[in-house]
Amino acid sequence: MEKKRLAGLDGIRLWAIILIVAEHTGFITENGAVGVALCFVLSGFLAVYIGGEHPEEKFFSLKKWIQYYVQRAFRILPMYYFCIAFYFYFYPSICFGSWDSVLRHFTFREAGIHFWYLQQEVFMYLFLPLIMLILGILGHFVLKKLGDKKEWVYIVLLLGFAYYFKHHPLLHLYGNNSMQVFRIYLFMMGMATGYFCRMMKRREWNLSKGKAVVGNVAANLVILAVFLVTLLSSPMFLIKVGIDIRGQYYGVGHDMYFGVLAMVWIVCAVFCTAGPIVKFFGNPVFVHLSERSFGIYLFHMLLRINATAAVPDGYKSFMIIMFFSICIAEVLYVILEKPMGDFGKHLSFKKLGQYYKGLFVRE
């Protein structure tokens, strides 16, 4: 499978982060859970879609397990630990009552305020190799005669277990001062989407020019419709047309609905590369900001705490916090996130040294 970057997916990730920040700043109420659902499904999709040919079989090797965990660790932990240390030093009362609490955060046994999202994602990455190994064993030893059609079985199994784990949680994690359901079902929905897109990409689509145009137009309209649903389904908009769902917090209670919308959006973004809506979500600015979205997510809450007294909730608070979050994320991406992520792939101190030398030393 060709590892070609799909810019439209960056637009999904950035929009998800915007929804989360918008809720935390009181700009768009109760839509943060929608953003979380988009992120989890997208993470599951990418785990399969860019995993190379037969990604489930690579985990037959213990070396691949270790490689995978090392890459994920260097991608996530340096930024996370830096953020935890920063919060603890300047604002220890926010979510850390003691050094023991800091240790629990470091090991993801506890996750205060917005860190619960990252806690969920880390556990999803811990489970991913096991899920892929089970699929690989099934495909290699039981479904081998089906060839590539065995991926339909993977899809059915992943969606079936996603539905099961939604109603019978695999486990609970302590995050944001309460026991949170482990949302691995959203991750599995994304994985199923990844297998579906892989299969469809392998097919020969001999479409006429007219059919291709119609398909692109339809995909653009579907993406626009999904985007509008994720935005306008906020209670702050619905109440203006006489629909009052305040207190129901539908995003958490019915996040599988938004997971399905995320699946639809992803499929359209993968197969549609033309049209104004697709180009809008895949524009270079969105791609750039999406790459920094991890830093934006980690540090926006710190700015939110500082801005509470100075700027009231709403549009101004959102714009100010988003701007400064982007500035912080930009700096940290260059000096920490990118080099550590690359180091996790190559484990080369030489390349790491060359990166920092090129960054700070001008010939």
Named regions from a protein language model:
Residues M1-A7, F27-E30, Y68, L173-N176, ...:
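Juxtamembrane loop-transmembrane helix junctions in multi-pass integral membrane proteins
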Residues M1-Y163, L170, L221, V287, ...:
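Membrane-cytosol interface segments of multi-pass membrane proteins
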Residues F27-L38, F106-Q120, M124, H167-M189, ...:
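Interfacial loop-to-helix transition and helix-capping segments at the boundaries
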Residues F60-L62, G136-K149, M199-V214, G275-P284:
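Membrane-interface helix-boundary motifs at transmembrane edges
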Residues Y89, F187, M191-A192, N216-D342:
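Alpha-helical transmembrane segments of multi-pass integral membrane proteins
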Residues P129, L133, A192-R203, W265-A274:
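Alpha-helical transmembrane segments in multipass membrane proteins, preferentially the mid-helix core
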Residues E151-L157, I184, M188, A192-C197:
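Hydrophobic transmembrane helix bundles of membrane-integrated enzymes that assemble
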Residues Q180, M189-M200, K209-A218:
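Extended low-complexity acidic/polar segments
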